[in-house]
Every structure is written in C-alpha cells, then in structure tokens.
Design a protein with these regions (language model features):
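Short, well-structured N-terminal submotif of metal-dependent ribonuclease cores
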Residues: 1-34, 46-59, 126
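Active-site neighborhoods of divalent-metal-dependent phosphate/nucleic-acid chemistry enzymes
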Residues: 67-108
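Acidic, PIN/NYN-like endoribonuclease modules and their adjacent C-terminal/linker elements
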Residues: 1, 95, 99-126
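Short hydrophobic interaction/assembly module
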Residues: 54-73
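Structured helix-beta-strand junction loops
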Residues: 28-29, 61-65, 101
Length: 126
C-alpha cells in the first residue's frame, strides 16, 4: 500500500516536473490509501486553485481508492508523531495513517525526511 501526501498530489495534478517524478511512485488505485485529511487538504487547495468541477473529479477518484477516516488508533499515533517528530497536526495524521496501515508515504515535503516508511520526491526546480 502507498499513501500519497497532499504535496505529491498537488505536484502530480499540476503536471510539474516534480509531478512527473511522483508518477513513477504512484500505485494502482487498489493499493492507494487516501486519509480523509488528504481529502480535506485537496478539497481546500483544488477549490481555491481550479474550481469545484475539478475538485469533484479528484475527490471522486479518491473514493475509488482506500479512503481511511481518522479513528482513535490513528489519532493516538498522530499525537505520538507530533511529540516525537515535531510534525504539525495534519502531517502527523497523514504519517500516522501510513504507519498504522503499513503503507509507504509518498511526499514532496522535506519535513518528512528521515522518518521511517517515507519516500520523499525531491522538488525539481523548473
């Protein structure tokens, strides 16, 4: 299983050079975990940047993947990730979701560097 962080989603959706690098790491939909936190962040970004039609399309795509709601196990693991790794709450929820589900976290965010189970795609300057 793979969990694609919002940063990697955005790079992929805009078709940036970094997004092209992300493409090589994307799983089949059946192996793609999508935390509800990522759905929230994507909806915020997409609505602001490209409008509701594109937002609806992307969220419909996510619903064909394995959507993972925030539950107590993930919340407690996220609190621990905040404490141990100094992650912001949303990042900790995404990281904890990946860990709880034994998934690889695909991200473009440097603040995940060095964390277990993380594959970071370096941002490519255009």
């Amino acid at each position: 299983m793979r969990l694609v962080d919002t940063s990697a989603w955005i790079e992929w959706l805009i078709g940036s050079p970094t997004g092209e690098a992300v493409t090589a790491h994307l799983p089949e939909q059946s192996d793609w975990l999508v935390p509800t936190m990522v759905q929230l962040e994507l909806t915020k970004w997409l609505t602001r940047e490209v409008g509701e039609d594109k937002t609806d399309q992307v969220i419909a795509f996510t619903q064909l993947c394995h959507v993972v709601p925030l539950d107590t196990e993930i919340a407690l693991a996220a609190a621990e990730a905040c404490r141990v790794h100094k992650l912001a709450t949303a990042d900790a929820i995404v990281f904890a979701t990946a860990r709880v589900h034994d998934a690889v976290l695909i991200t473009c965010d440097a603040h995940f560097d060095g964390l277990p189970g993380v594959t970071r795609i370096e941002k490519i300057k255009a």
